[in-house]
């Protein structure tokens, strides 16, 4: 059985959903060729530490992005078909977006699953802003798009189960009822709120503004701290095997920046800006690239917060996180080409948490992690389009050109495929979160629309200022 989105898998024979993304990451050991420095921050609880020096730039600067008309046509296709997923694979009654769906459908919502994801819905709300701006949904008017956003926000505010404003990760797409085994998720609520705020700023509609503001201001961020120095990853209801807050914390640098900044910027339930320094920030050196990175996190951890928060020209006491993600992407490309030269080339590289022939895995590097087998995950390159546009676009265009007959469908790329295996393997599904990061970063590298829209809300900029960005 293929494991679905974001580290969750169905427990064999139980019908329950189990979280294994972070468990998988924690179990992966460091490989040779990487040097991990001591954590920077106060993640262990209040130590005084010295911020790292700014990473040394590589010898070759990042190139200027001057896309050709063919490049723009490709990006249009990637964005338009990705946006179509968030229109067709969402319930018109609840607005929830399916976590995953087959990539060979003809316009109907996938009948084989009812699993919606609040993270996919957050990406979807943002994708609808892009779709409206570019006129991508030829079968939907602006009025219809606004109505869908209103429906989505209203249903989440008034009909979805929540705990102090935090939502269950996976819910029934038709009813909103939490799926058995699902957790109340801190980070996935953050992705939903990013989409909520993006929609509030973009549509400038009184109903959307009211609903979005109520949703964001209802989240009781301090509650998810559970008295600790960092956020708990989840809370489980009394029906779970281990009810209450999870012992796992968002205490080390990863995709967590959006979570902390949304909490710091909250006008109703803020956390103190001092929690920003409680995050441990280990540094990794690989082949001359030095950057902040956990010892076991895939490439998406350097991408997702950047889809909404604009870190390009701002640094805090530790680093410029946009530059940090450039180095992380360069290191990942180098890792693929140097470690597996028989599989990966300059036009075929990029792995991050995804489905694969054996189910689901959180894989990547450096350091090497997971059962790397020559599979490529298109959203790894797509999610880094804003960081290395030329290199990533080369990969994406080649993937479509060379393997598009099976790797590209109604909504763009399938989640992953392996052109090196015998027989070749192609996933038949696409995942909402992976299409989402691809669409958002493609638009950001072209126009910066998501950045400028999201950052026009007062809360993100205020949070960054409070956290010490300048």
Predicted regions and their residues:
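N-terminal secretory signal peptides
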Residues: 1-40
């Amino acid at each position: 059985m293929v494991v679905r989105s974001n580290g969750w898998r169905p427990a064999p024979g139980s019908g329950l959903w189990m979280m294994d993304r972070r468990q998988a990451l924690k179990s992966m050991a460091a490989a040779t060729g990487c040097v991990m420095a001591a954590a920077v921050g106060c993640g262990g609880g209040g130590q005084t530490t010295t911020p790292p020096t700014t990473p040394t730039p590589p010898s070759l600067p990042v190139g200027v992005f001057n896309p050709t008309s063919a490049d723009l046509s490709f990006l249009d296709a990637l964005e338009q078909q990705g946006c179509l997923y968030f229109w067709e694979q969402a319930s018109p009654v609840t607005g929830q977006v399916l976590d995953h769906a087959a990539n060979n459908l003809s316009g109907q919502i996938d009948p084989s699953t009812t699993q919606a994801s609040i993270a996919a819905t957050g990406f979807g709300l943002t994708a609808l802003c892009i779709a409206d701006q570019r006129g991508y949904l030829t079968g939907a008017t602006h009025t219809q798009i606004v109505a869908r956003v209103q429906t989505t926000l209203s249903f989440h505010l008034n009909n979805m189960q929540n705990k102090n404003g935090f939502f269950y990760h996976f819910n029934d797409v038709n009813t909103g009822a939490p799926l058995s085994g699902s957790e109340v998720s801190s980070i996935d609520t953050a992705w939903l709120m990013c989409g909520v705020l993006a929609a509030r700023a973009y549509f400038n509609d009184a109903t959307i503004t009211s609903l979005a503001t109520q949703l964001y201001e209802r989240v009781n961020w301090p509650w998810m701290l559970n008295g600790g120095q960092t956020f708990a990853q989840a809370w489980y209801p009394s029906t779970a095997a281990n009810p209450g807050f999870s012992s796992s914390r968002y205490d080390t640098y990863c995709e967590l920046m959006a979570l902390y900044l949304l909490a710091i910027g909250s006008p109703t339930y803020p956390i103190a800006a001092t929690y920003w320094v409680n995050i441990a920030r280990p540094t990794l050196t690989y082949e001359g690239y030095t950057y902040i990175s956990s010892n076991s996190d895939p490439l998406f951890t350097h991408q997702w917060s950047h889809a909404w928060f604009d870190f390009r020209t701002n640094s805090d006491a530790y680093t410029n996180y946009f530059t940090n993600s450039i180095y992380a992407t360069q290191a990942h490309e180098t890792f693929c080409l140097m470690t597996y030269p028989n599989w990966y080339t300059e036009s075929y590289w990029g792995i991050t948490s995804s489905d694969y022939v054996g189910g689901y895995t959180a894989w990547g590097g450096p350091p090497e992690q997971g059962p790397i087998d020559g599979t490529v995950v298109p959203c790894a390159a797509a999610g880094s389009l804003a960081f290395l546009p030329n290199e990533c676009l080369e990969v994406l265009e080649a993937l479509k050109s060379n393997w598009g007959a099976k790797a590209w469908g109604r909504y763009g790329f399938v989640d992953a495929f392996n052109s090196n295996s015998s027989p070749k393997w192609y996933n038949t599904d696409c995942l909402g979160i992976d299409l989402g990061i691809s669409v958002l970063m493609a638009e950001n590298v072209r126009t910066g629309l998501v950045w400028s829209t999201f950052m026009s809300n007062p809360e993100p900029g205020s949070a960054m200022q409070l956290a010490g960005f300048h």
